[in-house]
């Protein structure tokens, strides 16, 4: 038997705690998010300038896409961060209606039905437009 010296609820709290920096950058990403497709899809992005301002690393962005997905009425959440000039790391999460692995694989990425990602080149708006075409097809398909 292994004793960790922590009560179960204490472990959950410590595992879910974020640094002040991580909380600030998540807050900014949530504030700057945009809903589209009648609110069924949401997107947010953090550019390199913002990453540098906060002295953030990619790991500091963990959890943002999940927080976006948890918004009531959202079927698909997209979070992107700029890795290079006109290049983005894209993370997608869905609830039930969208197979984000299909979307990601079209752009050379992969993952699971509810959690997937890829790397895309182009402007932020071009990337979102390209992703949204594939997401919209799935959402419309659900309605007939």
Task: Map each language-model feature to its residues.
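Hydrophobic helix-and-loop "lid/oligomerization" segment in the mid-to-C-terminal part
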Residues: 3, 8-106, 111-144
